[in-house]
Amino acid sequence: MAESEGSNTENGKVGAVKSENLDRGVAAIKNQFLTTKEKFHAFIDADGKDVTEKETCSELSLNDAENTTRTENAAEPEAKRIKLDDGSSEGQDQPPKTAENKQEKKRARGQNKSRPHMKHSQFEENKLCPSVTQECASKCFFGDKCKFSHDVAKYVSQKPEDIRPNCHLYETFGKCIYGVTCRFAKSHLGEDFKNIINEELMKEWEGKVLVKNSLDKSLKEQLRKKKVVFEKSDKYLKLCFKSGDSSKMKNPVVKEDSAVQVTQKDSPITTVGAVTDEDVIKLRPCEKKTIDFRNKLYLAPLTTCGNLPFRRICKRLGADITCGEMAMCTNLLQGQPSEWALLKRHHSEDIFGVQLEGAFPDTMTKCAELLNRTIDVDFVDINVGCPIDLVYKKGGGCGLMNRTNKFEQIVKGMNSVLDVPLTVKIRTGVQEKVNIAHKLIPNLRDWGVSLVTLHGRSREQRYTKLANWEYIDQCAKIASPVPLFGNGDIISYEDANRALQTGVAGVMLARGALFKPWLFTEIKEQRHWDISSTERFDILKDFTNYGLEHWGSDCQGVEKTRKFMLEWLSFLCRYIPVGLLEHVPQKINERPPYYMGRDYLETLMASQNVTDWIKISEMLLGPVPPNFTFLPKHKANSYK
């Protein structure tokens, strides 16, 4: 410790940016790694080539600030940038502040709600017909009217160069279903551009289901034509309408017959052959599947970033419970494929749930019944914590906390049609200083909820202040014996330990998992992992491979993988390596200043400029296509 303190003092004399000069809310980093914005971007733009063999990244940051100027615009606004006062501007004439200058320095807050999205046609102009790609024996159904190309040779001549010489899908499964359209096709194409198949490797995967919960075509048609029958939901909803206000209803659960009565009423036809379930008695509430949630690490259902490849990363690094992204119940009932894609489950997710959002008992109950008989999940979660206006103004998300009667009907209705546990995720309240969760939790316990997850912030508060763990502790005691999980500001194993010292049954990780998915490993092994840039890059490699498996290895799949990687990199860049911190651990509400990493890759990963995120994606997924545009979900940076 004494040695490191001495080196910090010495570096401070040379002219490094001192940590004590940092603004409030900025993470404290060792002096030898701190730098200025100009030096940081100059180093990134030069690809680290200006560093000699004897000169390290940290030594570069000790040069005088006046000798380094940024030669081009970084394409980033002043929003969320930390101004480091290194004294270089003292005594210089500054231009008068005008209205235009004030406008430029205006902070960009919130989300980019109307983001540009690249259409499928923009990925490749000359798209090959699926009948050719899949090497179908029969001719194209559309014949001469087909709008896609059937000329394989022409397609290959216009196709961009392969990204890598080896295809992950072919090397893993023995066959790449994308054939000639694969961006790694040379490794599995034979004569006349025919797909090569590794029969031995394919046999190893034969009969195994890797991803569950796909939308069946026949079910999609039935949903769109409104031909699906919801027998249980209709019974429950009739009871609700008859009794009117749910507060007058003692127990609005569908009346169930005893096992003896069911066997007497139903006389199923005797079947021959495989065992069927026509004569199986449905589970009663007391016989529902139970899950021991206690002392498990729960990955939060994260919109956009909580996709299946990311969940696989977290699962491999120690997550116990995973949950799909928030799905709108009305969209599911309409059979929208994009919404059903959010329910997909990888076989490695052993405790997996789906999260539903809705504002009315009829749609939520019907959706629960539909999922109960069509997909494989371990629990269903109700989103009562979503703060966005689109959901809240319709009465969903946080809005349900103020609509107790409707909330009760939704919970009891879903419970009556589900064979798996029903869980609820809530916030402390809607208004910043008005906590109402403690009033709601006893009702949730009485309504039959199996788990409550409490985010220690209100809707209005968002992330402006730290989560209120004292209040979470109070609510956990009220919820007993129902387990309550706490959520908020956990970014190290020490934070998790402090949280578990309260009355909570476990912790949910959200932003902490986005910043550092190896947080699950740190908590289980009770250590601070000073992960290297190479190890972090290997995690991105795994995400790339998982993305190609999930979204495809053709042009469209590659660009989808890139899109979600860029969204994730907007969070990953906020991680500060343990070896650079003056005080371990990093605090989630502290912004990282400009610093030089221990190598070029670590410095590149620290950049909050979207052009540098794209540079990282190009290391894994090749160059971006022409006219590529990307606007992050949050108003931090943009690339056009």
From Swiss-Prot:
Its EC number is 1.3.1.89, 1.3.1.-. A zinc finger (C3H1-type) spans 123-153, 161-191. Residues 104-120 have a biased composition (Basic residues). InterPro entries: Aldolase_TIM (IPR013785), DUS-like_FMN-bd (IPR035587), tRNA_hU_synthase_CS (IPR018517), Znf-CCCH_4 (IPR041367), Znf_CCCH (IPR000571). It is an enzyme of class 1 (oxidoreductase). FMN binds at residues 301-303, 355, 425, 455, 487-489, 510-511. CDD domains: DUS_like_FMN (cd02801). Its cofactor is FMN. Residues 1-23, 43-123 are annotated as: Disordered. Keywords: Flavoprotein, FMN, Metal-binding, mRNA processing, NAD, NADP, Oxidoreductase, Repeat, tRNA processing, Zinc, Zinc-finger. The active site is at 386 (proton donor). Residues 1-11, 58-72 have a biased composition (Polar residues). Residues 43-57, 77-86 have a biased composition (Basic and acidic residues). GO terms for biological process: mRNA processing; regulation of translation; tRNA dihydrouridine synthesis. One of its GO terms (molecular function) is mRNA dihydrouridine synthase activity. It catalyses: 5,6-dihydrouridine(47) in tRNA + NAD(+) = uridine(47) in tRNA + NADH + H(+); 5,6-dihydrouridine(47) in tRNA + NADP(+) = uridine(47) in tRNA + NADPH + H(+); a 5,6-dihydrouridine in mRNA + NAD(+) = a uridine in mRNA + NADH + H(+); a 5,6-dihydrouridine in mRNA + NADP(+) = a uridine in mRNA + NADPH + H(+). Catalyzes the synthesis of dihydrouridine, a modified base, in various RNAs, such as tRNAs, mRNAs and some long non-coding RNAs (lncRNAs). Mainly modifies the uridine in position 47 (U47) in the D-loop of most cytoplasmic tRNAs. Also able to mediate the formation of dihydrouridine in some mRNAs, thereby regulating their translation. Belongs to the Dus family. Dus3 subfamily. This is tRNA-dihydrouridine(47) synthase [NAD(P)(+)]-like. It comes from Xenopus laevis (African clawed frog). The lineage of its organism: Eukaryota, Metazoa, Chordata, Craniata, Vertebrata.
